[in-house]
Amino acid sequence: MAGNFNQIEKIGDYTVITASMNYASTTQLLAKRGMDILGGLVGCIITLIVTIFVGPAIYIASPGPIFFAQERIGRNGRKFKMYKFRSMYMDAEERKKELMSQNKVSDGMMFKMDFDPRIIGNKILPDGTKKTGIGQFIRKTSIDELPQFWNILKGDMSLVGTRPPTLDEWDKYEPHHRARMSFRPGLTGLWQVSGRSNITDFEEVVKLDTQYINEWSVKGDIEIIWQTAIGVLRNDGAM
């Protein structure tokens, strides 16, 4: 089923040719979008219920907005606002620069730390003991990702796809890295269920994302959703 597919689209004031690494029929695309709409609706209802409990806990621990909106890169380089429950302190983005030397992904294409002090409640006590709070809890259980069901319902994202990079990560991409964004970004994906947060080699992420795009099928998406659900229940790592 794999194959290249190009189409002419309007992005802002520009008319451009966009590309897909895997051609899918209209029926297949409608099936995927149908899954997204259904999943998005159910997910938004769950998110509203969870907000009743998680929202106050976030605000008490770190006064400020309970939701976090960040500009991300979507399909074919489009920018969109991605939503999460706020799991970090308000100055997290500013502090990120100070912590880059501790980034587990050496090439800087993603940012991962073993114990991130920007997460709400995270602190190292004088005796070296590490203390966590609501921020670590909602990240470990992937509750912080729930607001992205709104992105899915809007069409910015899909239930399954490639994870959307931040603008600074996108600027560092080489041409073969950008190919992973020829598909609509997803809440979960192949690399998440292949190692979830444990993967620290960005080239491995690109390899798995490219494999997902080339071998995409509705059945494959269902399998990834199932594996993601099992991973979350087992606390295999944050999405």
Residue ranges: model-predicted function:
Residues 26-95, 151, 218-239:
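A hydrophobic, helix-centered structural microdomain
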Residues 50, 130, 142-143, 198, ...:
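Amphipathic alpha-helical protein-protein interaction surfaces
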Residues 108-183, 224-232:
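A short, structured surface patch at a secondary-structure boundary
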